[in-house]
Amino acid sequence: MFSPIGKVAQPYFCSFLLSTILGFVIAPRTIAALKNIQKGRNPVRSCFPAAHLAKKSGIPSMGGVIILLPCILSTAIFGDLHDRDIWVILTTMVAFAILGGVDDYLKFTRQNPQGISLEAKLFAQLLIASAALIFLSYTSDSFTSTHIFSKGLIDLGWAYMPFAYIVVVGSSNSVNLTDGLDGLATLPIITSTAILGIIGHLSLQFGAEPPGVVGANIPIFCSALVGSALSFLWFNAHPAQVFMGDLGSLSLGASLGLMSVMLKCEFIYAISGCIFVAEAISSMAQVAYCKLTKGRKIFLVAPIHHHFEKAGLKEATIVTRAWVIAMVSFVVSLAAIIYIYR
């Protein structure tokens, strides 16, 4: 059914290997530097469970640099920097990383878990997403189309642009919400990235949609991201030595959402990232229900992983079960890919 990968896989493997090695090399010194800079000043919201407050305060954030730097360097070495697609992804990722980094910095300098206001953060996210999406709308022949579990593209017309905003900005914030327990967000990031990389490779191999995506840059980027995320997971797994922070979660979520838009696989991405979707829905449902009922709640705490934590489940149990769900969703996503590309 699928043609042999052949020599095209060589840059994928090299990108993955270099990024993994670089991640392991820079992680210890990066963690030490972040500890020295932040000096244990990593505020945690008081509404979270008491055990969470006790264990997480003092662990340095902004560890997303351990993922981003090796990924960017490896992509620059093995990718084609003359291709506009990779620049859209890298520029968007860096812009969201700067936004998240400023948010993280304000949190530990002000000793306030709020950081940038929600309104200002959302405005900045929409601004960055606008630049990327408007650029893509002028450079892609099929920008307003997508796969809705069909073998062909379906043109959504004017409705696609707001849909794309929801995908990119929603993905960014969903990953950010998920990054609340040791390793919880990292493995779903890895599995979702792998799915997008596979779709990117198949688009290259078969000359399939979307016609605006050319070359192996997206799978090379995804290979690098999987490698650096795996090395980060080594230090982020329970008991975590570092958190990716908003710097990592906002930028990685935006990158995944943007790639799904470029590859026209937003719905497959939603399946592979179902953990992110569940976390976002739980938070939105909690806020909406609380406003409608004047204070009543659906969950003990939102997002939902903190609900389970406050209900008495151990952190390791919550994370392991989330990882199981992520792996199952990975397999289901593969099945969807096979259906579309067979």
Curated annotation (Swiss-Prot):
The protein's annotated pathway: Cell wall biogenesis; peptidoglycan biosynthesis
InterPro entries in the record: Glycosyl_transferase_4, PNAcMuramoyl-5peptid_Trfase, PNAcMuramoyl-5peptid_Trfase_CS
Requisite cofactors: Mg(2+)
Catalysed reaction, written as an equation: UDP-N-acetyl-alpha-D-muramoyl-L-alanyl-gamma-D-glutamyl-meso-2,6-diaminopimeloyl-D-alanyl-D-alanine + di-trans,octa-cis-undecaprenyl phosphate = di-trans,octa-cis-undecaprenyl diphospho-N-acetyl-alpha-D-muramoyl-L-alanyl-D-glutamyl-meso-2,6-diaminopimeloyl-D-alanyl-D-alanine + UMP
Key words of the record: Cell cycle, Cell division, Cell inner membrane, Cell membrane, Cell shape, Cell wall biogenesis/degradation, Magnesium, Membrane, Metal-binding, Peptidoglycan synthesis, Transferase, Transmembrane, Transmembrane helix
Its EC number(s): 2.7.8.13
Catalytic EC class: transferase
One Pfam family linked to the record: Glycos_transf_4
GO CC entries: plasma membrane
GO BP: cell division; cell wall organization; peptidoglycan biosynthetic process; regulation of cell shape
Similarity comment text for this entry: Belongs to the glycosyltransferase 4 family. MraY subfamily.
Name this protein carries in UniProt: Phospho-N-acetylmuramoyl-pentapeptide-transferase
Source species taxonomy: Bacteria, Pseudomonadati, Pseudomonadota, Alphaproteobacteria, Rickettsiales
